[in-house]
C-alpha cells in the first residue's frame, strides 16, 4: 500500500493502526507486538482511530433516537460515548493548556501548570465550553445520518492535523510525552493530513472546502500561539489542537448538512 510518499507493508499498516487505537482510545485490544514502530511513525493512522470514535458516537446517537429520545439527550449520550472511548485524553490536554497559557507568567511556569494534574478555572471553563458547543451542534442535527457524517468527519479530520503539528513544532520540554514520541517525518505528516481530510467529503464539496480552510486557519493560529507561549508543543497542546479542530469541523457540519 502506498500513501503520499510513504510506502508501508501490510504488517506495518496494521501495526500503525493498532498502535493509534491503543494510544488514542481506551478500547479493549489484545497485547500486540508493534515491532519497534513508535507513535511518530504511526501518527498517520490517527484519523482511523478518530473514525472509529466517531462511529461509536454515531451508533449511540442513532440508538438513543431509535428508542424515542429527543435530539438533545441523544447528543449528550453520543458525547459521553466518545469521551469514554478516548478516556478524556484530548479533553485533559485542552484543560491543561487553558490553565497553563491562562495562568502562567513565564514559559517555565506555564509548563509546570500544564504538568499539574489539578484543574483550574481556565481549564474548567475550556472544558465546559468544549462540551457545550459540541452538544449544541449535535443536538441541532435532524437525524442520525447527519450525526454520523458530522461525528466521523470531525473526529477523523481533527486527528489528521496532529502529525503535521508534531512535525512543524519542536517539543517544548525534553522529558514529555511528545518528546518521547520522536520526530514525525514530512511524509508521515502529509499522509495523516490526507487521510483525515477524506471523511470531510461527507459534508459535501462546499462543506469540505470550508472545513479545510477553517482547519488551516486554526492550525496556523494555534501553531503561532504555542511558539509564543512555550516555544513548542507538548502532548497537552496536541490534545488541545484536536479539541478545537473537532469543534471547528462540527460547526461547519452544522451549516453544511442543514443547507
UniProtKB/Swiss-Prot annotation:
Assigned GO CC terms: plasma membrane
Primary site of residence: membrane
Residue ranges crossing the lipid bilayer per the database entry: 41-61, 67-87, 119-139, 148-168, 179-199, 200-220, 237-257
Pfam families from the UniProt entry: CobS
Pathway: Cofactor biosynthesis; adenosylcobalamin biosynthesis; adenosylcobalamin from cob(II)yrinate a,c-diamide: step 7/7
Location in or out of the cell: Cell inner membrane
Membrane topology category: Multi-pass membrane protein
NCBIfam families: cobS
Name of the protein described by the UniProt record: Adenosylcobinamide-GDP ribazoletransferase
Encoding gene (name): cobS
Amino acid at each position: 500500500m502506498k500513501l503520499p510518499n510513504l510506502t508501508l507493508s501490510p504488517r506495518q499498516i496494521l501495526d500503525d493502526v493498532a498502535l493509534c487505537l491503543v494510544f488514542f482510545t481506551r478500547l479493549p485490544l489484545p497485547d500486540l507486538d508493534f515491532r519497534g514502530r513508535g507513535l511518530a511513525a504511526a501518527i498517520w493512522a490517527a484519523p482511523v482511530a478518530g473514525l472509529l470514535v466517531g462511529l461509536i458516537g454515531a451508533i449511540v446517537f442513532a440508538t438513543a433516537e431509535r428508542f424515542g429520545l429527543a435530539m438533545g439527550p441523544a447528543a449528550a449520550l453520543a458525547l459521553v460515548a466518545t469521551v469514554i472511548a478516548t478516556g478524556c485524553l484530548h479533553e485533559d490536554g485542552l484543560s491543561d493548556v487553558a490553565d497553563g497559557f491562562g495562568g502562567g507568567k513565564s514559559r517555565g511556569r506555564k509548563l509546570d501548570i500544564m504538568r499539574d494534574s489539578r484543574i483550574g478555572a481556565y481549564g474548567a471553563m475550556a472544558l465546559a465550553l468544549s462540551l457545550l458547543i459540541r452538544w449544541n451542534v449535535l443536538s441541532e442535527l435532524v437525524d442520525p445520518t447527519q450525526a454520523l457524517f458530522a461525528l466521523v468527519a470531525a473526529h477523523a479530520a481533527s486527528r489528521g492535523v496532529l502529525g503535521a503539528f508534531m512535525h512543524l513544532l519542536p517539543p517544548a520540554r525534553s522529558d514529555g510525552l511528545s518528546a518521547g514520541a520522536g520526530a514525525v517525518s514530512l511524509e508521515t505528516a502529509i499522509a495523516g493530513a490526507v487521510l483525515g481530510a477524506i471523511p470531510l467529503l461527507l459534508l459535501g464539496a462546499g462543506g469540505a472546502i470550508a472545513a479545510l480552510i477553517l482547519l488551516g486557519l486554526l492550525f496556523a493560529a494555534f501553531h503561532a500561539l504555542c511558539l509564543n507561549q512555550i516555544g513548542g508543543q507538548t502532548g497537552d497542546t496536541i490534545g488541545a489542537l484536536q479539541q478545537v479542530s473537532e469543534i471547528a469541523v462540527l460547526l461547519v457540519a452544522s451549516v453544511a448538512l442543514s443547507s
